[in-house]
């Protein structure tokens, strides 16, 4: 039995992994460290240099950008400005302060700028402030304007040279083409058509002969024939090309690229050079140069970002050789979906590109200022305008598709969000254009991107998740680790291979049986070759072996026990639903885990980890103080009932005691969804698989009342309510307790400022913050103004605009934050005061809530039964959940059944000696002969408990307190009906399943409206819960009522309940007064129809039944007349006013 990291878990793993799971946040943190050139990055560089490795870039991201832009010269070349030695000062505020005060967690960036007068040689040097640069928190996130955000890594096509084959349907010929794609600059495309001529497209413009390009580069016909004469396609192309010499070719290219402009030789030469040979305009980037060199077998230096003449010639040669039928082993077309051709743009690179963009804009400003300012007076400070750089960075973090609002539903959701790979976004694919191939699982994804975890909707296959052991190399390609095999023996060496390096080798699986000396136990080994081909070969032909069975899946997928027994579609749902799990009141680690839980919880960053070994000196609910062994003391602050981005509750609690000895890296406090340092997303519940009176038909779930009473599945949700007092044209708004026309009992919980007290219970419509807004007053006459000046201010007319609890929300006030301009808080323009109220709500589980297992088995609670009515076991234990067995076979997620049985074994404990000799032999692999009740077990993915092991353990489970073994090797128990006490006629599968409560809570979805807001345009009720809208009675529903002949119900729905403006005011009055409902009037939509017909010059007259013409008036006239008759004051916004009713 392999030793598990968590000592409390007994593992069923047979394979001992030679490699620890790498830091799960390294994708984010290492990339950002490289960008800013942090100390951590400098240490990694030194370590790589010392060990002779080249897997760490030796120039930081910002340094690269400043080097690229330096020097900025004026148009005459007499002055230049260059940048060097960037540095950061410490951030002004901590992460917590930034979250509280709606600020960005950033540090001031300074750079040394040198202005050189090239005529005199004079140098002026200054340290220039380049703006506040957002910093990454230790958890791999950014705090932007007080909210936590994640920059998602982007999966893009790598720069380089790509060869493609397509079939011409008319001639049934293979046509070859090639694209040279730079990181930035013009594309160069070569193609051979069905007439065997070789063409070129420059910058996606019109096609022309490739020989024109060669002549423009200075080749004459003799030289072209000498190099390409053996290829018929090039000879045909040359014959059809009528350009004479270099000048003619250059002009021909210029005409194609700049039609309508008069060509000259010089401008044509400059154009061509700027397109491909000018580093300012064209850049392959290091990765592009690496790919071009690799494909075309060139030895050009990696820092040469422009194309060389040899690059172009070798590319043409390669494509014509492909067309001529060259040896496929040497010359092959590229697969664009292969991970050797797709790379990752990590956080650092994305921000670096944005800084580069800002500096390019700044460069233009600097050049202009150089020409306009006096040379003597110029200093770097006068030339530099940092606004474009600051704006560029701000724009990226605030609005980019890749800077996303962090998913903080639970720690796993946050961890997965940071490890996400997104093929969408700027420079990537679009949902509409992405076909099936790019979304599909590719053999090169193995160990790099998870084939399971991806969204179900239109983004399927475009958004993925990094595999557990994968890492990104300096070129942006994903690498995965393999154990080196030499002469049929597995060595201790571990090599990290990219997808195209891996294609050259033969790899064995991680579960291939090995002897103690590392040699293969069998004569034939199952291996994987290029393109995912599988075969058996002798051991001495094997090059590499997988490091772990779970290396192909992501973290979330690696947390599904018995994944190997689930259909991939259901495993996908299981992976995604774990991320929607709500933190419960009391977290409980799964009885059946995979051994991934502790590592995932630690790297997610929501637990508190001790930095150095020491002794716990002091602790409370809010902090833990550790005295380190070196004599230093550190206090760890704990987050208490903080709201997450999704409204779930973030709360940390200590799991150590005063005087405990703690080690470096030990978890000392649990966060949300963690139990004793392990990820704990749900609860272990006793489940029976049986139909129950049809109430669990179609995935519906039956639950025991015990789970409601004991708060087993209760969760805390925190909502933030905000109100601001602004300056209006009529005077400032005021936060006050003095609200007009409001009873004193309504204000009972408000303090003297008009803000609710902490601890108050609030329900819908209750005032949280009292606020009044000045009402418009008529212009005063001079006499009135004089009287007012003498006798003092008359009470101003104000209206109540207080912050109230929205419909459907309630709870307890747990926090109030007040920001005011007077206290020096930064507030938006025009805002004088801002109040935030936090309301916490305990939500018990209720019918309509969604529950799920980890195997894609999900359902909605249909009925909550009293515990005494639930089916019960022989010893009287009632089950917690009844699931429908029909949900298992066709969905093929058998993992849930195995989890049920193993969960029972873990809950009851086992003693193998109690089994027969036969079972003892089968269970030898487990290692733990006995386990007490409630023992947690780990069954790692693809290396977990086998069916015969579970069957054997079921036979060996410990008896209950009465000495009865309730469940035998079949895994089924005798159940009794809780209502009658009669036994069911058949045995039922019973056991423990880990059940998650998902964020799709019925309280957030259920909605009803009586009267509410109407659309300004159609005068019909708005739609949706957020707008407090109505339910749409659509076309098909109207047909249904028509079919039943329900004319009055239909008339009511189409008029007074919708857009008969006058009618609905009258109906409201009639209901209030208890009178009969009046006849409906004319709906607004009918008037719109008439207006549309009039706009088509059709004169429409509406006649009553007795032939009298009905006059169509504007709604405003109707409303005001009706309002006047009813005595409604339309100037006040109250529920009885027309705007609201």
From Swiss-Prot:
It comes from the Bacteria. It is an enzyme of class 2 (transferase). It catalyses: RNA(n) + a ribonucleoside 5'-triphosphate = RNA(n+1) + diphosphate. Keywords: DNA-directed RNA polymerase, Nucleotidyltransferase, Transcription, Transferase. InterPro entries: DNA-dir_RNA_pol_bsu_ext_1_sf, DNA-dir_RNA_pol_bsu_external_1, DNA-dir_RNA_pol_su2, DNA-dir_RNAP_su2_dom, DNA-dir_RNAP_su2_hyb_sf, RNA_pol_bsu_bac, RNA_pol_bsu_CS, RNA_pol_bsu_protrusion. One of its GO terms (biological process) is DNA-templated transcription. The keyword Transferase applies. CDD domains: RNA_pol_B_RPB2. One of its GO terms (cellular component) is DNA-directed RNA polymerase complex. Belongs to the RNA polymerase beta chain family. The RNAP catalytic core consists of 2 alpha, 1 beta, 1 beta' and 1 omega subunit. When a sigma factor is associated with the core the holoenzyme is formed, which can initiate transcription. DNA-dependent RNA polymerase catalyzes the transcription of DNA into RNA using the four ribonucleoside triphosphates as substrates. This is DNA-directed RNA polymerase subunit beta.
